[in-house]
Amino acid sequence: MAASWRDRIAIRTDDLDNNILSLSGGNQQKALFARALASDAQIILMDDPMRGVDFGTKLDVYDLIRSEAHQGRTFLWYTTETDELDNCDRVYVFRNGGIVAALDHSELTEEKIIHSSFAEAAP
C-alpha cells in the first residue's frame, strides 16, 4: 500500500523504509497527506500544510485535494498563505478565538479578509 501512495502522490524516495525526516520538506508533506488519505476519514484537518513547501509540490497537493473533494471528502485547513484560499469553497476568518467572517469563494477578496481580521467589532 505504501508504494501505491508513494506513486500516486509522487513522493520522491527510493526506499520506503527511510525515516520521514530524511525526506525534503515537500516530500514530508506529501507523506503526511498520504497517511491521512490512506485512512477512511471523510474530513481531513490540516494545520498550515503548505508552510515551507515548493511551488510544484503545492500544485500537486492542490490537485490531490480537489480530486479527493470531488469524491466526497472534506478538507479543513488553517493557512497563513492567501494564495491557498483560491482552492477553498468557503473561508472562515478568526479573530480572538472566534469566527468573525464566513465567506463563500465567490465573495472572497483580500480586502474582505483584511477587514474581517482587523476591523473593530460593532458595539
Please tell me what each predicted stretch does.
Residues M1-P123:
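Glycine-rich phosphate-binding loops of nucleotide-dependent enzymes
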